[in-house]
């Protein structure tokens, strides 16, 4: 099987941008508006996204799809309020002609996106877009892309990221993917397969056949490889799966069982938990030399390690103090410091790509909650709670988390997203039950 992410299929031309870099409800010191991302409530920015114009019916269909994907991406972020196309007073037919800004202002649009799809002689698609500040009439951004027609959704995600960054001042997260565990069948005979999809739930593909149980997939920093656990021949082993070639290999041959693998930020090492003599300790393996270094040596269960973005520290789960808590220590080993002190137990810690938060699962009072805290343990915040929420993973920009929720009984788990302020909880569509998500870095 071959699963090519086709990064090389996408060629981006030089950008043509003019005017401001930000737009939103509140004007800045230069008279330009900006979406203010804060920890409190956010007033979503009204934005108009007409269908991209095109010269042929088939290209027009793709143009409509591109505008719909952009609309859905921005709406799901919680920072934008796309205006219903039925309210539009102007029909965009030529993106080279400035829009009638008064018509867009009259429907309360503060930003406007126009675009065009053009079929090239070699069969490729040329996609162009313009981002406008309706109040000032300034073009904030513009770019053109060339790609094979089958990758039009990729174009839509990249344009969404461009818009998000121009209007918020922060990197987007739409041109990314999620690896997860697809689950099917009755609860007592559940089949679990490794699956890959776009961050919005589209383009699902299955990487394993479901003959063996798979768990805890994680991306490499390059997006090319996935590490995961598989229960083959009765014991869990850690594997590497190459997304582009479909090939896989066992990561070492360890005595006992191995759990919770995760890449280092430079992609050169894998950190994991190995069970030996009834205890589980943390080990790191150099992927080139295959040399393994032990990081912890305690009569406890140390598991679920996660690197800080700069690779200098790790956070992990340990019951060395009685019940599971979160600890931090140098990535090379050494003294571990406990950072979780609330009621209940803490598990599945993961460091934000920004380095500002550690997300976790917290169990207590019959509830499983998803929360975040600062790396020093301060500022603990519960984002969502319920019967069984677990497995947080950060978007590439660190502003959104994905997790899975299992209602119990005969039903199965589903994926959800929530932002770091606890707002905008949304279900992520998947073909079946889904658990153990892991968000990739940006693809571009």
UniProtKB/Swiss-Prot annotation:
<dbReference type="InterPro" id="IPR014167">
    <property type="entry name" value="Tol-Pal_TolB"/>
</dbReference>
<keyword id="KW-0131">Cell cycle</keyword>
<feature type="signal peptide">
    <location>
        <begin position="1"/>
        <end position="31"/>
    </location>
</feature>
<dbReference type="GO" id="GO:0051301">
    <property type="term" value="P:cell division"/>
</dbReference>
<protein>
    <recommendedName>
        <fullName>Tol-Pal system protein TolB</fullName>
    </recommendedName>
</protein>
<comment type="similarity">
    <text>Belongs to the TolB family.</text>
</comment>
<dbReference type="InterPro" id="IPR011042">
    <property type="entry name" value="6-blade_b-propeller_TolB-like"/>
</dbReference>
<dbReference type="InterPro" id="IPR006311">
    <property type="entry name" value="TAT_signal"/>
</dbReference>
<keyword id="KW-0732">Signal</keyword>
<dbReference type="InterPro" id="IPR007195">
    <property type="entry name" value="TolB_N"/>
</dbReference>
<comment type="subunit">
    <text>The Tol-Pal system is composed of five core proteins: the inner membrane proteins TolA, TolQ and TolR, the periplasmic protein TolB and the outer membrane protein Pal. They form a network linking the inner and outer membranes and the peptidoglycan layer.</text>
</comment>
<dbReference type="Pfam" id="PF07676">
    <property type="entry name" value="PD40"/>
</dbReference>
<dbReference type="GO" id="GO:0017038">
    <property type="term" value="P:protein import"/>
</dbReference>
<keyword id="KW-0132">Cell division</keyword>
<keyword id="KW-0574">Periplasm</keyword>
<dbReference type="InterPro" id="IPR011659">
    <property type="entry name" value="PD40"/>
</dbReference>
<dbReference type="GO" id="GO:0042597">
    <property type="term" value="C:periplasmic space"/>
</dbReference>
<dbReference type="Pfam" id="PF04052">
    <property type="entry name" value="TolB_N"/>
</dbReference>
<comment type="function">
    <text>Part of the Tol-Pal system, which plays a role in outer membrane invagination during cell division and is important for maintaining outer membrane integrity.</text>
</comment>
């Amino acid at each position: 099987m071959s699963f090519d992410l086709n990064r090389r299929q996408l060629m981006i031309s030089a950008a043509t941008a003019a005017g401001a870099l930000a737009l939103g409800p509140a004007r800045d010191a230069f008279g330009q508006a900006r979406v203010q991302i804060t920890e409190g409530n956010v007033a979503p920015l009204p934005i108009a996204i007409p269908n991209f114009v095109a010269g042929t019916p088939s290209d027009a269909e793709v143009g409509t799809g591109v505008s719909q994907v952009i609309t859905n991406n921005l709406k799901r972020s919680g920072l934008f309020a796309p205006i219903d196309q039925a309210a539009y007073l102007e029909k965009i037919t030529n993106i080279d002609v400035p829009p009638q800004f008064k018509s867009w202002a009259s429907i309360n649009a503060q930003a406007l996106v126009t675009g065009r799809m053009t079929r090239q002689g070699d069969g490729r698609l040329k996609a162009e877009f313009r981002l406008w500040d309706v109040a000032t009439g300034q073009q904030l951004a513009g770019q053109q892309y060339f790609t094979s027609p089958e990758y039009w959704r990729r174009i839509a995600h990249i344009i969404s990221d461009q818009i998000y960054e121009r209007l918020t001042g922060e990197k987007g997260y739409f041109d990314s993917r999620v690896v997860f565990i697809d689950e099917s069948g009755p609860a007592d005979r559940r089949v679990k397969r490794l699956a890959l999809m776009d961050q919005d739930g589209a383009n699902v593909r299955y990487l394993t056949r479901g003959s063996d149980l798979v768990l805890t997939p994680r991306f490499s920093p390059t997006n090319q490889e996935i590490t995961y656990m598989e229960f083959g021949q009765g014991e869990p082993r850690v594997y590497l799966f190459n997304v582009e070639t479909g090939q896989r290999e066992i990561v070492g041959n360890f005595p006992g069982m191995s759990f919770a693998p995760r890449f280092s930020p430079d992609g050169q090492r894998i950190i994991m938990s190995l069970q030996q003599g009834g205890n589980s300790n943390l080990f790191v393996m150099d992927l080139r030399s295959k040399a393994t270094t032990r990081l912890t040596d305690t009569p406890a269960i140390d598991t679920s390690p996660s690197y800080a973005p700069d690779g200098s520290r790790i956070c992990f789960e340990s019951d060395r103090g009685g019940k599971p808590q979160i600890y931090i220590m140098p990535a090379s080993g050494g003294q571990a410091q406990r950072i979780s002190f609330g009621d209940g137990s803490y598990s599945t810690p993961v460091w934000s790509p920004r380095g500002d938060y550690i997300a976790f699962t917290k169990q207590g009072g019959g509830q499983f909650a998803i929360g975040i805290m600062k790396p020093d343990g301060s500022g603990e915040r519960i984002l969502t709670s319920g019967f069984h929420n677990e497995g947080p993973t950060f978007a590439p920009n660190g502003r959104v988390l994905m997790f899975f929720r299992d209602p119990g009984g005969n039903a199965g788990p589903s994926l959800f997203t929530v932002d770091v302020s606890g707002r905008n909880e949304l279900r992520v569509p998947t073909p079946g039950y889904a658990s153990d998500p892991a968000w990739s870095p940006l693809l571009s």
